[in-house]
Swiss-Prot record:
Keywords: ATP-binding, Coiled coil, DNA damage, DNA repair, Hydrolase, Metal-binding, Nucleotide-binding, Zinc
Pfam families documented for this protein: AAA_23 (PF13476), Rad50_zn_hook (PF04423), SMC_N (PF02463)
Residues holding Zn(2+): C437, C440
Stretches of the chain forming a coiled coil according to its record: 181-240, 320-416, 450-657, 682-718
Protein name according to UniProt: DNA double-strand break repair Rad50 ATPase
Gene3D superfamilies registered for this protein in UniProt: Helix hairpin bin, P-loop containing nucleotide triphosphate hydrolases
Family according to the record: Belongs to the SMC family. RAD50 subfamily.
Length: 886
């Protein structure tokens, strides 16, 4: 197996990394924690869904912050290229595919199926790979300590021990076969019972066959009897069909005869009624002509009455209009005066409007003047000068206090400074190391120090006295200032109040002055408009005198001479129409003597005739109906006679049939009884046949069972032979020499492989020997034939033999072994041993075609021909490929 490529997506620290292995020795190099070993974990995960990490769940392999991860690995074996896709966490999406001629052929899906397929293709599992060609960090030589357990696991010796145990699978299988032989004894008993049961069933079948023959004979007799009655019944049934048809036809004819007889019952009465109303109906047309004449005559009378009413209205209207025209002429002089007054009034309306507005404004101003005077009388003039002077005096005193306080505070600060300086001198007297006074320069003895202390105390008392006096003056001034500040605030509030009152007083005086000026202006304007106002009032008086004449004139103003002429012409036309209608009236009276002279009598006559017409129209409807019925009844009479003849003919045909309803029902009962008997016989026959078939089936089934039981009985000799062979196998496995034989075979093969490998390394050994006795020790032989334990070898030699042993085991167990993976092999190695390891790795390339080396050691780059650099950027591993020329 050669690994060609791996892709890691959201796997451990890799976000999306693709690594191609193109060299014989591929060196993956980078700092610790860069993500190098994650690539080896990816190879293991891709092949076996496992890693070298101690994790709880595969989901922990997903890159932090991501929801899913994926590993894809491409490898070659026997000339074929395979692609494995693994999903971290989700097993159902795992696949293995064969890449052939540009096509992807899926070989297996889901995690377990894919694992089995990979094991089938590679020929080995995870345990073998981890024990041989995948070497973890710093564990090159661990093969020496793990060798006994590895060999025992690889050779499955523990499985052989399990086989020969008393509760092992061989013992269990012998027990199963023995139980099977015991069960065959019970089968013999079952076989005898089954054969006896078959004999019993055969006897019952013979009895059933005899019973079946008897019942079939009885069924034949009843069937023949039923056929005889059916023949007679079918003949009578055919006659009955004809009888039923004729009876049905006779029933229809009888019904029709009854219906026609019922309808012909009142024929004579209807004929009499028809003849009676025939003469009355003839009056209908005569009365309709009278109604037409009355309607025309009535129209003439209505028009005459209407014209007379119109003439009366026109005459009255003409009289009224003539009177109104006369009054209109009488009022024309008054109307003329009114129009002249109105014209002048309109000319003066603008002036009058101005006068009223000014007068209204003047009234408002006079009221305001009076109100302002009253309010001013209530207010007294306020003088604020005395308050302003007082505030100024207080403010001046506050300023004086502020200036004095400033001087006092400065003086207090100066005194406090002097006091601190004096205290400092007093306190430092004891610490003076020089024997001279720092103030006067005289020799400084204890007496001089005491004197200085007394002088300082006097100065301090004086200073405290001055400071206290100053503080008392400061406190007094501050108190005075606070009182003055309070006084000034009160005075300022009073000043604000008086200033406000003064402002109100002065504002009202100013407003009164403005109102007086406006009053004078308005009075002058009124004087200029007074003459117009007086003229306007005079015109208004005259208007009142003429308004009634004006309104009366307006009422009569719509009457004109032309209107009266039109009205007179209209009156003449109406009189002319009235004359024409009166002529028509006289003509109608002369021609139709039945017409009354007045409209009321005419209306009464019209109502009587219309009522008679309504009665006659109803009679005519009845007349027409009776006429149709009489015509129809004459046809019914003829139909009645024909139906009576048809009735006689049907009665004769029914009599000729000779049908007997009594015999028909008798035959029906006999046939029904025989059919039921025959059905019962058939049911019994069906039961007997069913029982017969069931017993035959039972016999067939039991015969099959007997055949199977006999076949099982034949197994007894085979089972005994199987038990014998298993017992012999168990005896062979119990032989202690078997394990030794197997171990020797494997030891020889591994020894040959190890010696073949180390021959390619530049070592001073002639051979390696493996001793499986006890702890499975390893020894080497020098060129001189000396036997040396591996623990006595140098570090480089031990590494060489460890690699050789791993490769030898892999070669013995794996046909397709061709890749060696070393993860941080230089851990715990000194510089010399690291160099030796490089030489060993270079030599190993002659044995294994592909080596993948993971390291942080820059020296190991010398061993590689294809360099893969890994570095961590943030939380993500990045890969860069570079070649290296040795």
């Amino acid at each position: 197996m050669i690994i060609r490529e791996i892709r890691l997506q959201n796997f451990l620290s890799h976000e999306d990394t693709t690594v191609k292995f193109e060299g014989s020795i591929n060196v993956i190099i980078g700092n610790n924690g860069a993500g190098k070993s994650s690539i080896i974990d990816g190879i293991l995960f891709g092949l076996f869904k496992r890693t070298n990490r101690d994790i709880g769940k595969n989901e922990e392999l997903i890159k932090k912050g991501k929801k899913s991860g994926q590993v894809s690995i491409k490898f070659e074996i026997n000339g074929d290229t395979y692609l494995i896709d693994r999903n971290v966490g989700e097993t159902s999406r795992d696949t293995i595919s064969l890449l052939k001629e540009g096509k992807i052929i899926t070989l297996a899906r889901q995690s377990t199926t894919v694992n089995n397929k990979i094991k089938e293709i590679l020929g080995f599992d995870h345990k073998i790979l981890m024990s041989t060609t995948i070497i973890g960090q710093g564990s090159v030589e661990s093969v020496f300590s793990d060798f006994p357990e590895v060999m025992k696991e690889l050779l499955k010796i523990n499985k052989l021990e399990m086989l020969r145990e008393s509760n092992g699978p061989i013992h269990s299988l012998i027990k199963v076969l023995t139980d099977r032989i015991r069960s065959l004894q019970s089968i013999k008993d079952i076989l005898k019972r089954e054969e006896a049961e078959i004999d019993r069933l055969k006897k019952e079948i013979e009895e059933i066959k005899v019973k079946l023959e008897n019942i079939e004979r009885e069924a034949k007799e009843k069937e023949d009897e039923l056929n005889q009655y059916n023949t007679e019944f079918n003949r009578i049934k055919e006659i009955k069909v004809q009888y039923d048809i004729l009876s049905g036809e006779l029933s229809v004819v009888n019904k029709k005869i009854e219906e026609i007889a019922l309808r012909l019952k009142d024929f004579e009465e209807k004929e009499k009624r028809y003849n009676k109303i025939e003469t009355e109906v003839k009056e209908l047309d005569e009365n309709r002509e009278k109604i037409n004449t009355i309607s025309s005559f009535k129209s003439i009378l209505v028009q005459i009455d209407s014209l007379k009413s119109q003439i009366n209205v026109v005459e009255n209207d003409l009289k009224r209009k003539k009177e109104k025209l006369k009054r209109k002429k009488e009022l024309e002089e008054k109307e003329k005066q009114y129009e002249e007054i109105e014209k002048r009034k309109k000319e003066l309306e603008e002036k009058e409007k101005q006068y009223e507005e000014i007068e209204k404004r003047l009234t408002y101003v006079l009221k305001n003047i009076e109100r302002q005077k009253n309010e001013i009388e209530k207010l007294n003039y306020v003088d604020t000068q005395d308050l302003e002077n007082k505030i100024k005096d207080v403010s001046d005193r506050i300023n004086q206090i502020d200036n004095e306080l400033k001087g006092l505070l400065d003086r207090r600060g100066d005194l406090n400074g002097r006091k601190e300086q004096t205290l400092k001198i007093y306190n430092n007297l004891n610490s003076i190391e020089d024997d001279r006074c720092p103030i006067c320069g005289r020799p400084l003895d204890s007496e001089h120090k005491a004197k200085i202390r007394e002088e300082i105390k006097v100065q301090l008392l004086e200073l405290n006295k001055q400071i206290t006096a100053l503080q008392a003056r400061i406190n007094s001034l501050i108190k005075e200032r606070e009182e003055l500040e309070a006084t000034r605030n009160k005075l300022q509030l009073e000043l604000q109040k008086r200033s406000k009152e003064k402002g109100i007083y002065e504002a009202k005086l100013k407003e009164l002055q403005r109102l007086e000026e406006e009053k004078n202006k308005l009075q002058n304007e009124i004087l200029s408009l007074l003459s117009y106002h007086q003229e306007f009032e005079n015109i208004a008086e005259k208007e009142k005198e003429l308004i009634d004449y004006h309104e009366e004139y307006l009422k009569n103003s719509d009457i004109l001479e032309e209107d009266i002429q039109e009205q007179e012409q209209r009156l003449n036309e109406l009189n002319s129409k009235l004359s024409e209608l009166e002529k028509s009236y006289n003509d109608y009276k002369a021609k139709y003597q039945f017409l009354p002279a007045d409209l009321k009598s005419l209306v009464s006559l019209e109502e009587r005739i219309r009522r008679r017409i309504s009665e006659l129209e109803k009679l005519k409807i009845e007349y027409e109906r009776l006429k149709e019925e009489i015509t129809r009844m004459k046809g019914l009479k003829e139909e009645y006679e024909k139906l009576k003849e048809e009735e006689d003919a049907l009665l004769n045909r029914i009599s000729e049939l000779g049908y007997s309803e009594k015999r028909y029902k008798q035959l029906e009962e006999i046939i029904d009884k025989l059919s039921k008997i025959l059905s019962g016989i058939e049911a019994d026959k069906g039961k007997i046949k069913g029982s017969l078939e069931e017993k035959i089936k039972n016999i067939e089934e039991k015969e099959r069972n007997i055949e199977e039981l006999r076949n099982k009985m034949n197994e007894e000799s085979k089972l005994n032979l199987g038990i014998s062979k298993l017992q012999k196998l168990r005896e062979v496995l119990d032989n202690k020499h078997l394990q030794s034989h197997i171990m020797n075979i494997v030891r020889n093969q591994i020894e040959n492989n190890v010696n073949e490998v180390i021959a390619k390394f530049d070592l001073s050994f002639s051979a390696v020997e493996i001793d499986f006795v006890g702890k499975s020790e390893l020894y080497v032989y020098t060129a001189s034939g000396q036997k040396i334990h591996i623990n006595a070898l140098s570090g480089g030699e031990r590494i060489s033999i460890a690699l050789a042993l791993r490769l030898a085991i892999a070669k013995a167990l794996m046909n397709q072994f061709s890749t060696l993976i070393l993860d941080e092999p230089t851990v715990n190695l000194d510089e010399y041993r690291r160099k030796e390891l490089i030489d060993v790795i270079r030599s190993a390339i002659e044995i294994v075609p592909q080596i993948i080396l993971v390291t942080h050691d820059q020296e190991l780059i010398q061993a590689g021909d294809y360099i893969i650099r890994v570095e961590k950027k943030g939380d993500t591993s990045k890969v860069e490929v570079s070649s290296y020329d040795r």
